[in-house]
Amino acid sequence: MSVSVHENRKSRASSGSINIYLFHKSSYADSVLTHLNLLRQQRLFTDVLLHAGNRTFPCHRAVLAACSRYFEAMFSGGLKESQDSEVNFDNSIHPEVLELLLDYAYSSRVIINEENAESLLEAGDMLEFQDIRDACAEFLEKNLHPTNCLGMLLLSDAHQCTKLYELSWRMCLSNFQTIRKNEDFLQLPQDMVVQLLSSEELETEDERLVYESAMNWISYDLKKRYCYLPELLQTVRLALLPAIYLMENVAMEELITKQRKSKEIVEEAIRCKLKILQNDGVVTSLCARPRKTGHALFLLGGQTFMCDKLYLVDQKAKEIIPKADIPSPRKEFSACAIGCKVYITGGRGSENGVSKDVWVYDTLHEEWSKAAPMLVARFGHGSAELKHCLYVVGGHTAATGCLPASPSVSLKQVEQYDPTTNKWTMVAPLREGVSNAAVVSAKLKLFAFGGTSVSHDKLPKVQCYDQCENRWSVPATCPQPWRYTAAAVLGNQIFIMGGDTEFSACSAYKFNSETYQWTKVGDVTAKRMSCHAVASGNKLYVVGGYFGIQRCKTLDCYDPTLDVWNSITTVPYSLIPTAFVSTWKHLPS
């Protein structure tokens, strides 16, 4: 009887215009959770007791397993715990923190504040409440400060909170003067102290502070840490210390004189220092290499795209100051800095002839000289420094020359220049020829991003050169096909900005040079094609470029800690930037 009635109803419904009706009550999940929470509070149908401190919490296994992989594994495994009706956390988790986690499990809500954020993050990670862990990390990111960034660095490292770690790390680098006085600094593990003090981005212009911080860390637990002294000394740019301080304070330090390896490190630094003071050749030792905060920014440009002048960017005064005329004006060249020198390679002159020439500007002595010419005349190429050598990558060349190619074909050829021998050498060619690519070095490798391919298309590839193996690979693709972009490096992150499309011209990304992963960052302040970028200290600077007929007139700065771009100053209208480099500022005496 019931079947026939059902069939009759179905038959009547089928004659209408609506055959299916999906009913969904949006508040249903909330109402179920609310009722489950009420059942928990009344201890109805609960099947497990959680103990923390002196408190006990009755719960439903199914609810806990649904929101925590930790409990899911515990209750579904074949171990003893899966059959137990009680779980005892003892003192491994505070009862008030466990109560907050359980309230979240039964309500999907929790209040995070300054008092509980760290404890909640730790407990959320321990019990695998991933949403809670991530929410607490986001809260702590927004409340990051120079006074707490060291603690956040340790916390995020212990619990794999990647973004919180990166932001804390950047803030530590940017606020070294503050964090070195913090008690947390003295309690950092050895590997983290070494990583911090050796960083190129550590913001200090006085290496005495780095040396004193290293010695303070050693002395804090001398018995256990004395063996790390040689490694800590190698993080200090000892040859950049004032000569008197190096000779009288460092070389005479008892902890150093009593340890053979440490003594040898200081003696080598003294030899480098004397070589610098006597201007006796090129000093390439790490102990004599200024950090990026000890760098000066130089802009190359002119009143047209024909570059004829070099300018100094005064970051403090926010001024762009003319410094020197370029001996041979040119366009579509590439510029790169090694130490205190700016290398200008190739390009096209006023007659549009493609050049092999290499001009070198010594910022210390403020004079130009000519280096050995490249093996291939080229323009539209990229250049970067790697292990104290200059590399030129891709570009176009003329129809005649050492390695002939049509002017319309992008080159595969890559050359290496050694400043100590003044000689050029061919190295392994690119996997695909490119021009107008963004070329940088990071983590002892060269990277070429995008560019114009041999077939005139925008290349959506990242090409990577391994100097040890002398070969190029393609470890990743770009988020979009790119050319006329700019790139600059902070640590293991390569930042790419600008481009020749409506979208890419205002976008910016960062590329991890170790994992080859891309992350979108804040958009630049203005659309830019053919812009130029450098890193200085813990920040990025971008200048120049245009979009359509509109020229970009500002010098902008990006702070990765805040993920924010700001305009620093206005570029004179009469100046069209064509290259941007960062050199060593000085070699202190």
From Swiss-Prot:
Its main location: nucleus. Gene3D superfamilies: 1.25.40.420, Kelch-type beta propeller, Potassium Channel Kv1.1, Chain A. The keyword Ubl conjugation applies. Ubiquitinated by E3 ubiquitin ligase complex formed by CUL3 and RBX1 and probably targeted for proteasome-independent degradation. Quinone-induced oxidative stress increases its ubiquitination. Residues 46-114 form the BTB domain. GO terms for molecular function: actin binding. It is found in: Nucleus matrix; Cytoplasm; Cytoplasm, Cytoskeleton. Primarily expressed in the nervous system. GO terms for cellular component: chromatin; Cul3-RING ubiquitin ligase complex; cytoplasm; cytoskeleton; neuronal cell body; nuclear matrix; nucleoplasm. PROSITE patterns: BTB (PS50097). It comes from the Eukaryota. GO terms for biological process: negative regulation of translation; positive regulation of neuron projection development; proteasomal ubiquitin-independent protein catabolic process; protein ubiquitination. The keyword Nucleus applies. Keywords: Actin-binding, Cytoplasm, Cytoskeleton, Developmental protein, Kelch repeat, Nucleus, Repeat, Ubl conjugation. Kelch repeats lie at residues 296-340, 341-388, 389-444, 446-492, 494-538, 539-585. InterPro entries: BACK, BTB-kelch_protein, BTB/POZ_dom, ENC1_BACK, ENC1_BTB_POZ_dom, Kelch-typ_b-propeller, Kelch_1, SKP1/BTB/POZ_sf. Actin-binding protein involved in the regulation of neuronal process formation and in differentiation of neural crest cells. Down-regulates transcription factor NF2L2/NRF2 by decreasing the rate of protein synthesis and not via a ubiquitin-mediated proteasomal degradation mechanism. Binds to RB1. Hypophosphorylated RB1 associates with ENC1 during neuronal differentiation, while hyperphosphorylated RB1 associates with ENC1 in undifferentiating cells. Part of a complex that contains CUL3, RBX1 and ENC1. Interacts indirectly with KEAP1. This is Ectoderm-neural cortex protein 1. It comes from Mus musculus (Mouse). The lineage of its organism: Eukaryota, Metazoa, Chordata, Craniata, Vertebrata.
